[in-house]
């Protein structure tokens, strides 16, 4: 099929959450570097101010009338249900206006899998549409199978006593029932309804996934067979086109602090943009970190401690504990931190972006997942890639100390570090010329130019 001239426009639709905005903006920059013009369609909930990385991009707002309080009041799952209903008509109007302005220049619509309202608008205007998955291929496969597994009573332990949740799920080794991507912010029924919409490829012509074959070859093969449309694993995108995409202000003073620390001596603690902790969990974590005798850099996001704006309601002993070995910031430049030679481990919620960024720098992990696909990622880090230690159950100082010392001091951690460096080399090889992700990206770009 003949390629059309470069410079055609791609419309990308982003989910208003940090973990989704970062990869879709990296994808946008990647496509822009390949010669495509870029339009980002976003809602008022994104709060994303274009940086110098995106001066050539067009940003348009999808009109909607949801109260701004819905983003926090409803929880992520119910909010996404409501947002998709609200934007279904308004995005058609928005896309119609873009077509009037751009004419035949628009090649396709690429939408985050959780913004599935975009598919109907693309279909109405006879535009090709592409699903973009910001989670792992394994998590995508789990979501696809969720309905069937639940109907066959295989996942019923999710509603049963915790002991039964340790049962392995047939054909999904090493995942247990409790590792399946369940949200703690919504009912099982509401979450399953969302998954039905996200995994329904409808009229999608292809799927892009921010992953690499060296990490998930079997899950990618399974997904390709299941979807029967092209699946393009083109990640990790942060290694292809790094971009400034943080919704929160990054405190770079922590880099100066890291510069004073010894190689591999610091455990970096950051639990993402959504997770919440109880005050007692914060105290237990601090005591465990202190008892481990390791230096630590800790991100405590404003609003992440229940009942507190930041850390002002924590006991006085907290500041005393921290002042000895630690450094606290409200938000950190994560990729820069993980690439710093002083960082020897990452205590993480195991969101997919954080997982890829940590592997991409050869940093082993302590895994404390909170919800959704984080549980899948944590299980794979520990049992498949063998570069992670999962902390399960309630947080207490003893568990924190043991996990940190296993990773940072003991021989077990050194083995993980060697495996992490090996995976880092494989990941970086995948995105350069001749690598699997590079080749997949070239195939996708060729496909886009034939539309």
Swiss-Prot record:
Keyword Transferase: yes
Pfam (any one): UDPGT
Transmembrane segments: none
A molecular function (GO) term: quercetin 7-O-glucosyltransferase activity
UniProt-annotated binding residues for UDP-alpha-D-glucose: 273, 332-334, 349-357, 371-374
PANTHER family: FLAVONOL 3-O-GLUCOSYLTRANSFERASE UGT76E12-RELATED, GLUCOSYL/GLUCURONOSYL TRANSFERASES
Protein name as it appears in the record: UDP-glycosyltransferase 76E11
Species the sequence originates in: Arabidopsis thaliana
């Amino acid at each position: 099929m003949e390629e059309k001239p470069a410079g055609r426009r791609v419309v990308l639709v982003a989910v208003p959450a940090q973990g989704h905005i970062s990869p879709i903006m990296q994808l946008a920059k990647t496509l822009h570097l390949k010669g495509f013009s870029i339009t980002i369609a976003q809602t008022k909930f994104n709060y994303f101010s274009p940086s110098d990385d995106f001066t050539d991009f067009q940003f348009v707002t999808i009109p909607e009338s949801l109260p701004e309080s819905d983003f926090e009041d409803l929880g992520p799952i119910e909010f996404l249900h409501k947002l998709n209903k609200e934007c279904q008509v308004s995005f058609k109007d928005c896309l119609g206006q873009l077509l009037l302005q751009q004419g035949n220049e628009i090649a396709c619509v690429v939408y985050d899998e959780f913004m599935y309202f975009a598919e109907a608008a693309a279909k109405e205007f006879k535009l090709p549409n592409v699903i973009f998955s910001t989670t792992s291929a394994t998590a995508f496969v789990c979501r696809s199978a969720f309905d069937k597994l639940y109907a066959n009573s295989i996942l019923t332990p999710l509603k049963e006593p915790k002991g039964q949740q340790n049962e392995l799920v047939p054909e999904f080794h090493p995942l247990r029932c409790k590792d399946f991507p369940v949200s703690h912010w919504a009912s099982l029924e509401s979450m399953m309804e969302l998954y039905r919409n996200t995994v329904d490829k409808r009229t999608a012509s292809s799927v892009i996934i921010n992953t690499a074959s060296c990490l998930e070859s079997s899950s990618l093969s399974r997904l390709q067979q299941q979807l029967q449309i092209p699946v393009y694993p083109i990640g990790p995108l942060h290694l292809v086109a790094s971009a400034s995409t943080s919704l929160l202000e990054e405190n770079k003073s922590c880099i100066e602090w890291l510069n004073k620390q010894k190689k591999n001596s610091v455990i970096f603690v950051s639990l993402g943009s959504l997770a919440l902790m109880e005050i007692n969990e914060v105290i237990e974590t601090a005591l465990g970190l202190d008892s481990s005798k390791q230096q630590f850099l800790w991100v405590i996001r404003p609003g992440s401690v229940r009942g507190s704006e930041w850390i002002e309601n924590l006991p006085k002993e907290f500041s005393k504990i921290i002042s000895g070995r630690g450094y606290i910031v409200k938000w950190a430049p994560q990729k820069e931190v993980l690439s710093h030679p002083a960082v020897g481990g990452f205590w993480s919620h195991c969101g997919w972006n954080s997982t890829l960024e940590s592997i991409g720098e050869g940093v082993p992990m302590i895994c404390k997942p909170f919800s959704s696909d984080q549980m899948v990622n944590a299980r794979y880090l520990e049992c498949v890639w063998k570069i992670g230690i999962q902390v399960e159950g309630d947080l207490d100082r003893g568990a924190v100390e043991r996990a940190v010392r296993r990773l940072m001091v003991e021989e077990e951690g050194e083995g993980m570090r060697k495996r992490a460096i090996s995976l880092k080399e494989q990941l970086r090889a995948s995105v350069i010329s001749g690598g699997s992700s590079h080749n997949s990206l070239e195939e996708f770009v060729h496909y886009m130019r034939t539309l």
